[in-house]
C-alpha cells in the first residue's frame, strides 16, 4: 500500500482479512447531494426549484386575457459568510431572483394574438444555503435537516389480520397513496361487500365510484365477472361447459354427454374428471331446470314486443323469470360465474347495497360524503369529483408513485401520468378481489421497498411550492383586476408568503433540528439520521412494534444497532456506512457481482425490491485467489431468509463486513463480541463524548476513525498537494505543486483555522496544525486537527490503564474508581464555552443604558468592568459577578421628604433608574475570552464597541495584507523564473527592487507575453485586495440589524475548564457506563511488579450479565499495543540503530494470519522510520474492523511480541498495604470517554425561591431554580423512623404552608428558632377538588 508523507507519520496496524473492494463513500453525501439537486438549475424540470416553478407557472387570469410566465431563476451571493452569520445571529442565505414574463393578449382579436410582453427580474425572498458540512445556519445557530423515512406513494394491499371483527375474519383493503392529494381506500366489510373511502371519511359502496366514472351496472358486472351461458333448446336447458370451473365442486346431478356419464350425482368433481371432459371436447351439457334458480343475470333482458323489462342486470333468476324469458323469445341467458372458493360474488353483492343507479346520483352521494351539510348542485358535484383524482393541480402520484403503482399491478411500463385513470381504479379493485379470492399476497408495509427517504432538497422544494401556491392566488386576482398596461411582474408578486413558508420550514419544522455538536461523530451521525416521525410521518403514540422492528430489508441500508433508547426506539434510525438513495428515494446498498461462481470487483447497487430476486453471499465467505468460493455450501440471504446455497447459485456478495452497521457502530472494536443492547448504548454514548483538552487516538480502533474525522469537516484538509510554506496557530499556507495549478494563478492555498469557538453544546471547537514547515502534503491530507481528532483520526476519549477488580466497594453498581494521576495529567479536562448575552432595549420610560456608572453598587462589584460598563477580556469571574452594567429607567414614584432633600442636594440621577445587570449564573466560573458588542444602525457606539471595531479592522487588514504578501511572493517567484529564463542575469535582477521587475522588456516574444500576463495578474491581485479590504471595512463598521426595540446586544463568552471529579459520567465504547465514585491518591492504587499503578479500577461483575465481552478483548489488545510501544520507546531511549528499529516495527506490522495490510518499511527513509517510531512510543495503534477483527491467537502473538503474559492477566499489589492480591488480575488499556453529563451541570441547591401558583410548593428542576422533591418514599422513610417533627417540618413550613414559612422567616431573623406549622396549601387544593365533584367537605373545629 502506498502512504503519503503525512500518513507515514503514524500507521494503524490493520487486522482486517477481507480485501477492501470499495472505499467508504463520502459520509455527508446524502445531505449535500440532495440540497445540490434542489438548488441546481435542472433543464428537464424534474427536481428542485425549477420543478416547483414549472408546476405553478404559467399563471393565467380568470378571463384568459393575460398570463404570467416563468423564464428562469438565479441565486445571488450571500451577504455574510458562514462565520459572520454565526457571530451576528443571522441566517446564511442567498437572495432568489426570478425572471418572469407578463404576456397580455388582445381581447377582440382571435385566440393567441399577443398585445404586450413585459419581462422583469423579481425578488422572491431568501433561500438558506447549506454550508460545506451539510448544515444550515439559521438565526446564527447551526441546524440539520434530518431525512425522513415515509410511506412511498403508490398502491398498497393490506389486511387487518383478523383484528377488526369479532369473528376473526380477515378483511382485506387497498389504499392508493398519492404524493399529494386525496387518499383512496377500498376495503371489504365482514359481509364481503366492497366499500370505498376517500380521505378516510365515511365509507360508500365501491360501485359508487364506478358509477361516477360513468359505468352502468351491466358494464360493472362485465368488468369483474366471467359468464356462464345457458341456452334453452327443445324445452331443455343446456349449459356451455368450461370444465376447469367445475373443479372441487360436488355434482348436484349426473354430468353426462353423448350418453356417457362422466360424474355421478353427489360425487366430488376431481382433476381426473376434468381431464376426461377436456379430452372428449365436451362443450355443452344438459342441466336440470332447478340448477339455474339462484344464478344472477349479467345484463338487462327486455320483452322485445312490449318493451317491458323482464329482468334487470344483477337480479337472481327464479323459475318464473326463466319461463317469462323463454316466452319472450330469449333463448340464450348469460349469468355470472361465482363460487365460494375462488370467484366470490363481491361486486354483485355490492351493487345490491349501492343506493345509486346513475352517474348523477353517485356524484351527489360522493359530494354529500365529502361536504356534509352543503346543498349539492350538478356542477359542484362534478367539479369536486373531477378535482379529487383527475386534476393535476390537486393530485399527483409523482414518478415514484406511478412506478410503484404500475409495478404493483404487474404492468410492463413504469412511467405514466401523475393522475389516476379509470383503468387504474378498476385494476386496483380487480387485484384486491383477486387477493380476497386467494390469489396474490398482501404487501409488507415495513419493507424498505415500500418506504422511501425524503431528504432536505425534496422537503425544501415542497415547502417552496406551498409558498408559490399561496402567491398564485394573489397573482390571479391581480391579473383579473384590469389596468394591466401599467403593471409590471414585480407589482404582482409578493415575496412574503414564499419566504414565510421557507423560513417556517428551516426554523421550526420538526425535522429541522438544532445540530448535535458534542464531537465530530455526533455531527456526522445527526446528518445521517433517518426519522420516521415528522410531518407526513408517524407519531410516537401510534407507532406499534412492527414499524420499530428490525426488518430483513434493513440489511446494508439502515443500521440495526444505532437507535435511541426510550419512546423513539426504532423510529429514528441511522444510515448504514455504504447505503445511498436511488433516483426514486429508495435506499440501496452495494454488492459485488458473482459471475459463474467467480466473485468479481464489479459493483452493483441494489434496492430492497431488486435484492429480493437474488441470492447474496455474506462478506465473510472464504474465497480462493481466483475469487471462487472455497466451501461448496455458502451461507446466503435470499428473500429475507438466511440459509445455505450451493456456490453456483450465488448471484452477489456483500462488499464489506461493516456494510450492515452505521458509522457510529462501525467505530466499536470487537462489536461482534458484544450483546446488541449494549452495542446500542455504546454507539449512542460515543456521540455524547466531550472533546478533551489533548485528544488521544484510540490504541484499539476499527480503521474508520480517519474517514469520520476527515468527512466530518472539523479538520482542515488539503484541497491540493504542495509543500507547507508557512504555519502558525491560526493559518497554514501551502505552495501548490506545479501540476495541480490552474494556468495563470499564484499557486498558493491559504487555510485559516478556527480558534476557540463555541459549539451548539457549549463544547470548544479549536483547530491545531499537525504539519510543519517544508513538509510535502498531498490532496486529502489532514493539515490541522479539530476537536476530538489526533493526527487526522477521530479521538473521542483517552487510553486508560484499567484493572478489572473490586476495590473496597468503590466500584459497586458500575461505579468507577479513578487515580489522581488522571486529574494531574489533565487527561479528562475539557473546555466549555458559554455565551451570555445582555440586551439593551427601548422601554416606554426611555432607553436602557449600558454603563459603568451604576447607583448603589460598591467599587468591588464593578472592578472587572471598563468605563463602558463591559467586562474586560481575560477577567476571571465566578457566580454572581457583574459582566455588563445595565440600568433601566424606573417609573416616577411618590418621594419621601428625605429623598426629596437628597435629590435637591445631589441632583436628579440617583433614583430614577434600577439596575438590571448581566451577572454570571450561579455555579459557573471561568475566564472571559471574548466580548462582542452589536449596536443598532443610528445608535451611537460606545467606547468599547469602537475599540472592538478598531481591533477587528486592524486584524482584517493584517490578515489580508499577509495573504497579499504570500500571494505576491508566489507571483514574483514565477516572474523571476520567466525573467531569468528570458536572459536577465539573476544577480542583477536581485539588486533591482521587485516593483521595477515588471518594467523590464524581454526580446523573446513568448516570454514577454508571459511577463505581461503575470503583470496583469499582479495588478488584479492588488485591485482584489483593495476590494476585499473595503468590503471587510464596510461589514465591520455598518450598524447591525437587530430585532425591533433592541438598541444594543453585548455578548460575553466565558471559557470554563472542567476537570474530572466524582459524579461525572464515564463510559467505554461497549455500553459499559458508570459514575466516578472516588478519586484515589496514586499511592493507594493497585500497582504491578514494575511499580506502574493502574489509572482506573472497574468492577468485573459489570461484564458477565451484560455480555459485552468486546471490552475485555479490547483491554487485552490495548495492553499488547502499549507493550509494543514500550519496547519501541526503550529502543529509542537506548538510541539503537535505525535498522533494528525498522526490523522490530516491520515484525509488528507483519504479525497476523493473511491480513490485507502490507506495510513495507524498506521504502521508508531513516527519518521517516524515526518519526514513525516517535509516534508509536505511546503504543502502536491497531485497527480491528467490525466482524473482521483480530482473533484470539493474534492477540496472544502480539502480547508475546511485547514481552507480556499471553493470558492478559498480571499480578497486582495493593497500594495501601503493599500485599499481593490473591489472584492475577486482567489489566490492559481501554479507551474511556467522558460523557456530557457533568456533575457541575447537575449540582443544584436552593434556599428560597419561586413557588407554584396553585399548590404553593417550590418548583422542580435546576432550570426553574427549584427545590428538592421530598417524595412519597422519603416520607415513608421518616414515618418508619418515627421522626414526627422532622416530617411535620418537611410537609409544612419547608413545603407549602404559606403562613408558616413567612412566620418561620421572621422567627429566624429575630433569632427565635421555633416553628408554628399551619395548614398546607395542597390540603386546600384537595378540598377544592373534592368540592368540584359535588361533595361538600368542611373542616370543623372541635
UniProtKB/Swiss-Prot annotation:
Family annotation (CDD domains): RNA_pol_B_RPB2
BP term (GO), one: DNA-templated transcription
Listed EC numbers: 2.7.7.6
Stored Gene3D superfamilies: 2.40.50.100, 2.40.50.150, 3.90.1100.10, DNA-directed RNA polymerase, beta subunit, external 1 domain, DNA-directed RNA polymerase, subunit 2, domain 6, RNA polymerase alpha subunit dimerisation domain, RNA polymerase Rpb2, domain 2
One of the record's GO cellular component terms: DNA-directed RNA polymerase complex
Keyword entries, A-Z: DNA-directed RNA polymerase, Nucleotidyltransferase, Transcription, Transferase
Keyword Transcription: yes
Subunit-level organization: The RNAP catalytic core consists of 2 alpha, 1 beta, 1 beta' and 1 omega subunit. When a sigma factor is associated with the core the holoenzyme is formed, which can initiate transcription.
Function statement: DNA-dependent RNA polymerase catalyzes the transcription of DNA into RNA using the four ribonucleoside triphosphates as substrates.
Entry similarity comment: Belongs to the RNA polymerase beta chain family.
Protein's UniProt name: DNA-directed RNA polymerase subunit beta
Species this chain originates from: Salmonella typhi
Lineage, top ranks: Bacteria, Pseudomonadati, Pseudomonadota, Gammaproteobacteria, Enterobacterales
Gene that encodes the chain: rpoB
